[in-house]
Each structure stands twice: as C-alpha cells, then as structure tokens.
C-alpha cells in the first residue's frame, strides 16, 4: 500500500533457432543450454503424465475427457498422452482444446472449429470456437466423469491456457465432475514478478488476482484457485494433482515442444514476460518473422535504432502487427539466458520504444486499451507516459508481490 501511495505521489510530481514458416511441431524446442544449466538438470524431470501408476487407478472404469494440445507428450518417447490413454484402455469420450487448437497451429485468438481426432475418432470440443459456452454447459460436461489436464503452460498471467483450465474447473465444480491435473514444470517458475491483476480489468488475458509472472505450475495454481475460492461462486472443485518428479522452482526446464506458434524456443519463452506488453501498443514484437517475441520495432523508430525486420504473413501469424512494414528496433535473440533471468520481467523495452516514438512526436496512440488488460493495472501505463523510471514503476508492485508469495506458500508442491 505504501508503494502504491508513492506511485500516486510520483504522478503528481511528474511499460534463432526456429523459423515458424517451416517449424515441425513434433521435433521439439531449441535446447541451447549453458554448461552451468546442463549440470543443473542432470536428473531428468518426470512429468505428471508419465506417472501412470498414480492416475490410471483414479480413472479406471470412468468416462474421461482430456484437456490438452500438441504439448501433451509423455516422456522421452514423445508419444502423445491421448495415444497412451487409448492404448491403456481408458474410456476416452472427449478432447477439449485451448487457444491455437489441439494441434497448436492456429493464430493467437483465432476461432478454432470443433472437429474429430482423425487417429482415434474422439470428438474435439474447441473452447476457442463458436460453441464455447455450449461446451462449458451441462450437456458437454455430462459427456465425462473425469477431466484430465495435460498441457504445457509458461507461467504468465496473460498466457491463456490457465484461463481455459479455470473455466473448465468452474464447469466441473458446478456439475460435480472430478479434475485431475498431470502437472508439468513451469519454464518461468524460478521467480515471481509484475503487478497483481486489478479484478476490474479481468479479461481473457487476466483471470485471477495474481502477478504477471506467478512462478507456479498449473497444478499449484489450480490448488490456489480452489483454496482461495477464486472459482465462480466460490464453488469447490474435486481436484487431484499428479506432481512432477526431480523438479524444483529453480530447475531451468527446456520444453520438448513449442507451447504455441509464436513461442518457438526458450529465448522467446524467457523474453515473453517482457515483450508481451507490446501486444498492447502499436509496436511489433516480431510476430510474422523468424524471431517472434525476440525483437521489437516500429517504422517510426528509425532515428533510434538501425536494426530492422519486416513482419510477413506466416502460419501462426497470418495478420501480424505492421504486416509488410519495415520496422526498426532491437534484436534480443542472442541475449544470454542468464541475463534474461536476472532482469526478470523488464519494462525497459516498452519504455525505450515509448521514448523513441515520443522523441519523433509519435507517442499519441502508442498504447491501446489492451495494454492495461495485459499489465493488470493502469498505473504502469500512466507512469511510463509520465516518464517515470523502471525502478520507480517496479517499486509499486514489490509489496503486493511479497504478500502474494506468502499467500501462495501452502499451495506449492515443489521447493
């Protein structure tokens, strides 16, 4: 509270490896690791879906729905969890897909139609399609007894997979269905940072009162959502989490497959907390190039930067910001991982772009209304516009983040 008052006072006184055009979703991610990183992950992380001895007895004889996408790969064999379940004789009655679809190829926010899995014949119900409300209703939820969740998150409040999971948990709580989460590591789980969502700004990119970088796995976050009565009407959801093995919050885990079209490698995933805010501005963050979320720029930033790129229409980004326009800005694709981890969620890039545009007399309209939804507070934008320093802006959320870390402690499954 003291920090927020300080911010108010300041107002008075004065945000390589992979080309998405040819990316094979089944070949996996860039696994460039520093020597230090390699020694840290000597023990292979075992994900929840590999621990069949724990969850198969829980679903025996029951009708099962699966919430997953292309990230639901089991172990080093990279067999999809759906195939494993079918082979084990589990009675699969539905597949539920998130943003980008079951195969992870659709554009951000694009409408994804219902379909049938060609391999198994199981219906795929899209929660990013025209039947979204219907699929959260009694008839669709009545298709199963247990919902299995096996999907790779990246630990950001504005990454939508957890939002879809919460909608499903709401529906399962309402209609008396069980939820079992096959937990996965959080690649950004080693820190907590960013403002906590003002629930007046609740949206599809901000659903729970948590920081931008919450530092929790989906299993831990689901436990907190239930324990803190964050589900609709405070409903209780019968929840079981199958935890990972050999994982802690300090484990730098390399994802085996890209979680979505524009996060093609670990560089993009680590920079995502700092570059996603550009989605609420007129600046491109590299969608439609071979370096999405690894660069940023705008045609009017030529006076500040010589590096350039031109967004094109590509699979997964068919209508990117500034399509066909030469953008000048910064290339962040070679910043060492250690440097990104140290800076955590940085506002330096948004501040740099804003100052550059302002110097050219182009700052009007720099921010869109989506920026406040992404950041979850209005003060971040307001302080950038008043040219406050990143240090001053970050000070505004430190107290509430410290309180959040205490509050979440009892829901954590990993050290």
Indicate residue ranges for each PLM-predicted region:
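Glycine/threonine-rich flexible loop motifs
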Residues: 153-165
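Short internal beta-strands
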Residues: 91-99, 182
């Amino acid at each position: 509270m003291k920090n927020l008052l300080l911010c108010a006072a300041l107002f008075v006184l004065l945000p390589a490896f992979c080309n998405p055009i040819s990316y094979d979703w089944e070949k996996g991610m860039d696994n460039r690791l520093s020597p230090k990183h390699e020694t840290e992950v000597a023990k292979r992380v075992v994900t929840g879906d590999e621990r069949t001895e724990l969850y198969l007895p829980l679903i025996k004889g029951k009708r099962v729905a699966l919430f997953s996408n292309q990230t639901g790969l089991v172990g080093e064999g990279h067999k999809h969890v759906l195939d494993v379940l079918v082979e084990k004789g589990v009675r699969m009655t539905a597949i539920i897909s998130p943003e980008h679809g079951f195969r992870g190829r659709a554009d951000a926010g694009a409408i994804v139609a219902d379909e049938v899995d060609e391999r198994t014949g199981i219906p795929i119900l899209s929660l990013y399609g025209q039947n979204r409300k219907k699929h959260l209703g009694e008839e669709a939820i009545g298709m199963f007894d247990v919902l299995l969740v096996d999907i790779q998150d990246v630990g950001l409040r504005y990454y939508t997979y957890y939002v879809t999971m919460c909608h499903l948990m709401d529906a399962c709580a309402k209609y008396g269905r069980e939820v079992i989460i096959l937990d996965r590591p959080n690649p950004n789980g080693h820190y907590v940072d960013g403002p906590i969502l003002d629930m007046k700004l609740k949206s599809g990119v901000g659903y729970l009162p948590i920081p931008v970088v919450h530092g929790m796995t989906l299993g831990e976050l689901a436990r907190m959502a239930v324990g803190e009565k964050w589900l609709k009407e405070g409903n209780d959801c019968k929840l079981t989490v199958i935890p990972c093995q050999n994982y802690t919050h300090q484990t730098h885990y390399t994802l085996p497959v890209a979680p979505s079209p524009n996060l093609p490698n670990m560089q993009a995933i680590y920079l995502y907390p700092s570059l996603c805010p550009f989605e609420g501005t007129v600046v491109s963050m590299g969608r439609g190039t071979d370096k999405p979320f690894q660069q940023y720029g705008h045609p009017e930033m030529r006076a500040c930067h010589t590096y350039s790129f031109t967004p094109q229409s590509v699979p997964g980004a068919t209508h990117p910001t500034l399509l066909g326009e030469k953008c000048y800005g910064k290339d962040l694709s070679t910043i060492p991982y250690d440097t990104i981890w140290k800076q955590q969620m940085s506002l330096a890039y948004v501040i740099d772009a804003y100052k550059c545009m302002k110097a050219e007399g182009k700052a009007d309209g720099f921010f869109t209304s989506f920026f406040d939804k992404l950041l979850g507070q209005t003060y971040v934008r307001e302080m950038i516009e008043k040219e406050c320093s990143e240090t001053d802006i970050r000070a505004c959320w430190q107290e509430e983040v410290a309180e959040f870390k205490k509050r979440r402690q009892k829901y954590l499954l990993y050290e």
